[in-house]
Design a protein with these regions (language model features):
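Class I S-adenosyl-L-methionine
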Residues: 1-18, 23-124, 210, 216-218, ...
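Short secondary-structure transition/capping segments
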Residues: 85-91, 108-117, 144-149, 172-186, ...
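Short gly/pro/ser/thr-enriched loop/turn and capping motifs at secondary-structure boundaries
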Residues: 42-44, 70, 132-135, 204-206
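A contiguous loop/helix-start segment that scaffolds small-molecule binding in enzyme catalytic cores
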Residues: 8, 97, 165-233
């Protein structure tokens, strides 16, 4: 009899509000025996907390995944390999594993690194889409991301602001908190502060909304989950 190998699922939990999780995500988590989720050095597991708001997870095996915050590619890769190894132990035992991902699993998500490693080892992987932080932020602000069917939309990390602001169309600058002073300076140089808005921790209890960044103090911390929307100038 052929041995069953588990499937590795990348499950999107949305930006913060559990009500934004899809029915597909909820059902997959209900049926998956092992739930993997990133854990911070201080023990926080935000994606798991969000999922618990929509799914009863008691009785599940919770697998914390530790990812290095270092910018050193070698350090990052070592963390990805170690996380993939931990997941594969359950897959080899015939258990499905669902990895929780903030926002959508296809957008700046750690799942992709583990997916590449595990697929190379013959494991089956499946991605379940979800609501992105920038779509939720646009809805929170009550504004369209694009002004029309023909307008381009550029999505980039906040650290790339200086390079993308000159491009045509609207822009989304994700995870902008760490480089916020530099990002705001680039936007000021481009004359786009008055056409920009920011939502921090969208859908979470500590959510903050800034419809206009003209008077935002660059020294004020916005946190890691800061999403900036820039209308075309």
């Amino acid at each position: 009899m052929e041995k069953r190998i588990g499937t590795f699922y990348g499950v999107s939990v949305g930006p913060g509000d559990p009500e934004l999780m899809t029915l597909q995500a909820v059902r997959r988590l209900e049926n998956c025996p092992v739930i993997a989720a990133p854990q911070t050095p201080k023990g926080g597991m935000l994606a798991l907390d969000i999922a618990k708001g929509a799914v009863e997870l008691s009785g599940k095996t919770i697998l914390p995944l530790h990812f290095a915050m270092s910018l050193d590619p070698a350090v990052q890769k070592a963390a990805h390999i170690e996380a993939a190894r931990a997941v594969k132990e359950y897959l080899d035992a015939g258990q499905d594993v669902a990895m929780l991902n903030l926002g959508d699993v296809s957008v700046y998500a750690t799942f992709g690194y583990l997916q590449e490693i595990l697929e190379a080892e013959g494991c089956k992987t499946v991605m379940l889409p979800g609501v992105t932080s920038f779509c939720a932020a646009a809805a929170r602000l009550g504004q369209s991301l694009t002004g029309g069917m023909e307008q381009p939309l550029t999505i980039a990390p906040g650290r790339c602001a200086a390079e993308v602001l000159a491009a045509p169309g609207a822009k989304v600058l994700m995870k902008s908190g760490r480089q916020l002073p530099e990002t705001l300076a680039a936007m000021a140089d481009a004359g786009l502060l008055s056409r920009s808005a920011m939502v921090c921790n969208c859908g979470l209890p500590n959510e903050e909304v800034w419809p206009d960044l003209t008077d935002y103090d660059p020294a004020r911390s916005a946190g890691y989950f800061a999403t900036i929307l820039v209308k075309e100038g």
